[in-house]
Amino acid sequence: MSMYRFPEPWATAEIPGPKKAAILSRPEALVAVLRRANRRLLVTGSKALDRVEGIDTIELIRILYSTRLFTVAASRNIASKLEDTGIPVAASISVYELGDRLRDTGWTGFDGFGRYDLAAFIGFPYITLWLVLSGLKHFAPGLSTISLDPYYQPHASWSLPNVKGDEWYSFIRKVSDSLR
Protein backbone atom coordinates (compact mmCIF):
# COMPACT_ATOMS: atom_id res chain seq x y z
CA MET A 1 0.00 0.00 0.00
CA SER A 2 1.43 3.33 -0.94
CA MET A 3 1.66 5.59 2.05
CA TYR A 4 2.60 9.19 2.50
CA ARG A 5 5.00 9.83 5.34
CA PHE A 6 2.80 12.65 6.57
CA PRO A 7 -0.68 12.11 5.14
CA GLU A 8 -2.69 15.23 4.61
CA PRO A 9 -6.37 15.52 5.42
CA TRP A 10 -8.56 16.54 2.49
CA ALA A 11 -10.14 19.43 4.41
CA THR A 12 -7.04 21.60 4.22
CA ALA A 13 -8.51 24.64 5.98
CA GLU A 14 -9.42 22.62 9.06
CA ILE A 15 -6.86 21.98 11.79
CA PRO A 16 -7.33 18.63 13.56
CA GLY A 17 -5.25 19.55 16.60
CA PRO A 18 -2.21 17.87 18.15
CA LYS A 19 -3.78 14.40 18.42
CA LYS A 20 -4.16 12.80 14.98
CA ALA A 21 -5.12 9.38 13.70
CA ALA A 22 -2.56 6.60 13.68
CA ILE A 23 -2.02 5.35 10.14
CA LEU A 24 -3.08 1.81 9.27
CA SER A 25 -0.50 1.13 6.59
CA ARG A 26 -0.61 -2.68 6.89
CA PRO A 27 -3.66 -4.96 7.07
CA GLU A 28 -2.09 -6.75 10.04
CA ALA A 29 -2.32 -3.55 12.09
CA LEU A 30 -6.06 -3.28 11.49
CA VAL A 31 -6.52 -6.98 12.24
CA ALA A 32 -4.79 -6.48 15.62
CA VAL A 33 -6.99 -3.47 16.45
CA LEU A 34 -10.16 -5.39 15.56
CA ARG A 35 -9.16 -8.44 17.58
CA ARG A 36 -8.49 -6.31 20.68
CA ALA A 37 -11.99 -4.83 20.65
CA ASN A 38 -14.87 -6.53 22.44
CA ARG A 39 -17.87 -4.83 20.82
CA ARG A 40 -17.43 -3.58 17.28
CA LEU A 41 -19.82 -1.44 15.27
CA LEU A 42 -19.53 -0.98 11.49
CA VAL A 43 -21.22 2.26 10.47
CA THR A 44 -22.06 2.71 6.80
CA GLY A 45 -22.93 5.97 5.12
CA SER A 46 -24.70 7.26 2.05
CA LYS A 47 -21.56 7.31 -0.10
CA ALA A 48 -21.48 3.51 0.14
CA LEU A 49 -23.79 3.59 -2.87
CA ASP A 50 -20.99 5.18 -4.89
CA ARG A 51 -18.09 3.50 -6.60
CA VAL A 52 -14.68 4.89 -5.61
CA GLU A 53 -12.24 4.62 -8.50
CA GLY A 54 -14.20 1.64 -9.80
CA ILE A 55 -14.45 -0.11 -6.43
CA ASP A 56 -17.95 -1.03 -5.19
CA THR A 57 -18.16 0.11 -1.57
CA ILE A 58 -21.11 -2.21 -0.86
CA GLU A 59 -18.87 -5.14 -1.83
CA LEU A 60 -16.24 -3.97 0.68
CA ILE A 61 -18.92 -3.75 3.38
CA ARG A 62 -20.03 -7.29 2.51
CA ILE A 63 -16.42 -8.48 2.78
CA LEU A 64 -16.05 -6.83 6.20
CA TYR A 65 -19.37 -8.20 7.42
CA SER A 66 -18.35 -11.73 6.37
CA THR A 67 -15.84 -11.74 9.24
CA ARG A 68 -18.83 -11.80 11.65
CA LEU A 69 -17.08 -9.34 13.96
CA PHE A 70 -19.38 -6.38 13.42
CA THR A 71 -22.83 -5.19 14.30
CA VAL A 72 -23.88 -3.02 11.35
CA ALA A 73 -25.59 0.36 11.54
CA ALA A 74 -26.45 2.23 8.37
CA SER A 75 -27.58 5.62 7.21
CA ARG A 76 -31.25 5.55 6.33
CA ASN A 77 -30.78 5.57 2.56
CA ILE A 78 -28.35 2.63 2.55
CA ALA A 79 -29.97 0.23 5.06
CA SER A 80 -32.38 -1.44 2.61
CA LYS A 81 -29.62 -1.88 0.02
CA LEU A 82 -27.44 -3.65 2.60
CA GLU A 83 -30.29 -5.90 3.67
CA ASP A 84 -30.96 -6.74 0.00
CA THR A 85 -27.36 -8.02 -0.21
CA GLY A 86 -27.78 -10.20 2.89
CA ILE A 87 -26.21 -7.89 5.47
CA PRO A 88 -28.50 -7.50 8.50
CA VAL A 89 -28.67 -3.93 9.76
CA ALA A 90 -29.13 -3.46 13.52
CA ALA A 91 -30.28 0.12 13.04
CA SER A 92 -31.06 2.61 10.33
CA ILE A 93 -29.87 5.84 11.90
CA SER A 94 -28.45 9.25 11.06
CA VAL A 95 -24.69 9.40 11.64
CA TYR A 96 -25.18 12.54 13.75
CA GLU A 97 -27.70 10.80 16.01
CA LEU A 98 -25.41 7.77 16.22
CA GLY A 99 -22.49 10.02 17.14
CA ASP A 100 -24.57 11.39 20.00
CA ARG A 101 -25.40 7.89 21.22
CA LEU A 102 -21.79 6.71 20.96
CA ARG A 103 -20.61 9.54 23.19
CA ASP A 104 -23.30 8.68 25.78
CA THR A 105 -21.58 6.50 28.41
CA GLY A 106 -24.96 5.15 29.56
CA TRP A 107 -26.05 3.87 26.15
CA THR A 108 -26.12 0.06 25.96
CA GLY A 109 -25.95 -0.35 22.19
CA PHE A 110 -28.58 -1.47 19.72
CA ASP A 111 -28.86 -4.89 21.33
CA GLY A 112 -28.81 -3.76 24.97
CA PHE A 113 -25.62 -5.71 25.78
CA GLY A 114 -23.38 -2.74 26.52
CA ARG A 115 -21.45 0.05 24.99
CA TYR A 116 -19.41 -0.39 21.82
CA ASP A 117 -15.68 0.05 22.34
CA LEU A 118 -14.87 0.38 18.63
CA ALA A 119 -16.74 2.05 15.77
CA ALA A 120 -15.50 1.67 12.19
CA PHE A 121 -16.88 4.05 9.56
CA ILE A 122 -17.10 3.52 5.80
CA GLY A 123 -18.93 5.29 2.99
CA PHE A 124 -19.38 8.82 4.30
CA PRO A 125 -18.93 12.26 2.75
CA TYR A 126 -15.49 13.41 3.92
CA ILE A 127 -16.53 16.51 5.86
CA THR A 128 -19.50 14.74 7.50
CA LEU A 129 -17.25 12.06 8.90
CA TRP A 130 -14.65 14.69 9.85
CA LEU A 131 -17.24 16.43 12.08
CA VAL A 132 -18.61 13.25 13.66
CA LEU A 133 -15.13 11.88 14.38
CA SER A 134 -14.08 15.22 15.88
CA GLY A 135 -16.99 15.05 18.31
CA LEU A 136 -16.25 11.44 19.22
CA LYS A 137 -12.54 12.15 19.65
CA HIS A 138 -13.27 14.82 22.24
CA PHE A 139 -16.45 13.57 23.93
CA ALA A 140 -16.58 9.75 23.75
CA PRO A 141 -14.24 8.34 26.40
CA GLY A 142 -13.38 4.70 25.91
CA LEU A 143 -14.44 4.60 22.26
CA SER A 144 -11.90 3.93 19.52
CA THR A 145 -12.75 4.93 15.97
CA ILE A 146 -11.49 3.73 12.60
CA SER A 147 -11.96 5.38 9.23
CA LEU A 148 -12.08 2.67 6.57
CA ASP A 149 -12.57 5.10 3.70
CA PRO A 150 -9.61 5.56 1.34
CA TYR A 151 -8.96 9.08 2.64
CA TYR A 152 -6.96 10.01 5.72
CA GLN A 153 -9.26 11.15 8.55
CA PRO A 154 -7.17 12.82 11.28
CA HIS A 155 -9.94 12.80 13.90
CA ALA A 156 -10.24 9.00 13.95
CA SER A 157 -8.20 6.90 16.35
CA TRP A 158 -6.92 4.98 13.30
CA SER A 159 -7.25 5.76 9.62
CA LEU A 160 -6.17 4.44 6.28
CA PRO A 161 -3.84 6.79 4.45
CA ASN A 162 -4.94 8.40 1.18
CA VAL A 163 -4.96 5.41 -1.18
CA LYS A 164 -6.14 4.47 -4.65
CA GLY A 165 -9.20 2.29 -5.15
CA ASP A 166 -7.38 -0.94 -6.00
CA GLU A 167 -5.12 -0.58 -2.94
CA TRP A 168 -8.20 0.06 -0.79
CA TYR A 169 -9.92 -3.10 -2.04
CA SER A 170 -6.78 -5.19 -1.58
CA PHE A 171 -6.29 -3.87 1.98
CA ILE A 172 -9.87 -4.70 3.06
CA ARG A 173 -9.69 -8.12 1.39
CA LYS A 174 -6.45 -8.98 3.26
CA VAL A 175 -8.01 -7.89 6.56
CA SER A 176 -11.05 -10.06 5.95
CA ASP A 177 -8.95 -13.07 4.94
CA SER A 178 -6.83 -12.71 8.09
CA LEU A 179 -9.89 -12.64 10.35
CA ARG A 180 -11.50 -15.82 9.04
Where are these regions (language model features)?
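C-terminal functional extensions of proteins
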Residues: 2-28, 96-118, 123-133, 138-180
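Redox- and metal-dependent alpha/beta enzyme cores, enriched for Fe-S-associated oxidoreductases
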Residues: 27-37, 44-97
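Nucleotide donor/acceptor-binding cores
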Residues: 37-40, 143
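Conserved beta-strand elements of the Class I
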Residues: 41-42, 120
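Short loop/turn segments at strand-loop or loop-helix junctions that form parts
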Residues: 43-46, 149-151
